[in-house]
Amino acid sequence: MILDIEMLRSFYASYSESVAQAKATVKRPLTYAEKVLFAHLFDPTQLRPYKRGIEYVDFRPNRVAMQDATAQMALLQFMNAGKDKVAVPASVHCDHLIRADVGANIDLPEACKTNKEVYDFLKSVSQKYHIGFWGPGAGIIHQVVLENYAFPGGMMVGTDSHTPNAGGLGMVAVGVGGADAVDVLTGQPWELKMPRLIGVHLTGKLSGWATPKDVILEILGILTVKGGTNAILEYFGEGLDSISTTGKATICNMGAELGATCSIFPFDQNASEYLRKTGREEIASLAQQNAKELRADDEVLTNPSAFYDQIVEIDLSKVEPHLNGPFTPDAATPISHMKAKGPANDYPMVGEVGLVGSCTNSSYQDLARAASVARQAYEKGIEVKGQLIINPGSEQIRYTAERDGILDDFKKIGALIMTNACGPCIGQWKRHTEDNTRKNAIVTSFNRNFRRRADGNPNTFAFIGSPELTVALTIAGRLDFNPATDTLLDKEGNSVKLDAPTGFTFPPKGFAVEDKGFIAPSEENANVEVVIAPDSNRLQKLAPFAPWDGKDLVDMPLLIKTEGKCTTDHISMAGPWLKFRGHLQNISDNLLMGAVNAFNGESNKVKNQLDGNYVEVSTAAKAYKAQGISSIVVAEDNYGEGSSREHAAMEPRFLNVKVILAKSFARIHETNLKKQGMLALTFCNKDDYNKVQEDDRISLTGLKEFAPGSKLTVTLKHKDGSEDSFEVEHTYNDTQIAWFKAGSALNFAAKNK
């Protein structure tokens, strides 16, 4: 059975009472996000009005979801915890390791062959420890979770940054690193800084070519990629009624690009219908019984500014189709502005490839509406200029879409149907091009468009739009085509216009599938043996990191001073490196290879202070490690933006990098660094970043007095003999300092179990 029905019955039986107790304790009305948070305290007796954005709180999530690229490291850590089974319901989803090449029929068998060792490992660990296993081809983690596991009022963590997708069905769903997931899997408290609350007030109704994707693309332009850090975005207002559950999931999904802890929509009739249409009638009924507490209190809705830390106003009737990019998802541009903005910024204006899919936009409704645009091109005799690639969100969606003729609509205009997997969105794309370094443009319905992310080409200008707009621009072959106003030529030379997209929210004949690709947890598999070959280059058992030696860090060489955006893609690249996600030593060879060196403007080329030669970042780090020397990384704002991959924290730790000193951090990555026993420090004065020189030896003092709220001192010894000193700060609490001293959170847990 897929649903953990007894857990859900127990949860809903006590949920409303938990909320009532919370309101009585804090003595005020509650937002919906607060209700869910307070209902999931690890120790309900500790309930009090926590200081948002300041205090850390222990929670007890209902479940854990893991994708195959991050599950490897998470489960390798779990295996060291000495548990017989997971403490909460959990699932593994094989979606990241499948490469998009020529089509699903060939790509999926090839992936099963290439990744057999990893799939066998994940399957055996799942069976042994009572974890649900979704095999390759079953679908993208967040679409599968929405269809099968998400439930209003619940709390979930997932080892993927787009876990907040489930907020579309009313969950507090948070992306975390593997070590955080292990806390939940082993029944320990899960620690989170009490989020700030950003209320997003939706009025009006979407129309024409505007979609839910355009709502979040517009919000990204307002708040930027840092604007949601340590915050939950809670949506409210009469505009909610016109947005489907999958549309709401799209909006919550890309809240990750704001840096938000998560995003959430209240339970409503659309959510109830989605639960029923996906075979969860009992959950819909249980939620309906608790409906009053699955939304913000009336007093909050009447006077939202008194309860939210910030309010964003969005009139849906004024939302335009957007095309965000290139290179960052918050470069928001209404499509009507592209004719002027494109040439002014020297964008390549020919859209060569359109990619529809990803966890953000691969629902039945997404495909149905996008197919309505493709169908027009075929029926109106319009020659399609670009290449179109489709990744369905799950096998249930693919099977149903094929039955209903949706996939045929795409195929008729030459589209390639790829596997139900992430594919190009995570860099798993064998792009067929003669020159993968040339300047070009692609349009996607994905969530991220960092340089090199999709195809490895630093000169690919990637833009993000809705599935409908992606198909329209692929048909036109131009980034400045506005389907609301512009016309195209048919094969006879006549001007024709594309009508606004249409499509069913749910399949008229219902969802259908022959094989979901799921293996349910079973007590019968407890004796399954988990084997890791000692000579494997894909999997490697983990050795504990060394504890702190009690000394200050003196004369550390600067490994790299990064310039500009440094995401987890820059720190630990995906694409071809995904195959090493279960082997820490091998994947560490990609450390910071995408980061730009502030001293030469180049990537993966830094000075090795031992011999003065310029080498790859990992080569320099390994040279220092071999000599027993700790090193330090210096960075700018929002370091670690993007994916939840904890490899971006484990790799520097493995290569003896002890400190990341940045202007600011992205939430998930800062936590991951702390979990691995590293020091994530920030400049008190951001201008001190400019004092760091290439040949500096850097000391960090004050560690013996390391305490919550304390300052540490950095001293730079420059090559000319001069020095600079300045204070740095941190956000560590007592527990996190204990992790540092123990060498990692896992070491601390093992020592204190």
Regions found by a protein language model. Name each.
Residues L3-D4, D68, F151-A284, L416, ...:
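Mobile "lid/hinge" segments at catalytic clefts and subdomain interfaces of large enzymes
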Residues F42, Q46, K51-R60, A74, ...:
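Terminal amphipathic helices with adjacent charged low-complexity linkers/tails
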Residues L76-N80, A306-A401, G405, E524-V659:
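Non-catalytic terminal/interface segments that mediate subunit docking, oligomerization
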Residues L8-F11, Y15, A20-P195, R581-V633, ...:
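Long, structured ligand/cofactor-binding scaffold of large enzymes
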Residues L47, E147, F151, I243-A249, ...:
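Short glycine/threonine-rich loop-to-helix capping motif typified by GTGT followed
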Residues E379-W429, S643, A649, A662-L681, ...:
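Extended C-terminal subregions enriched in glycine
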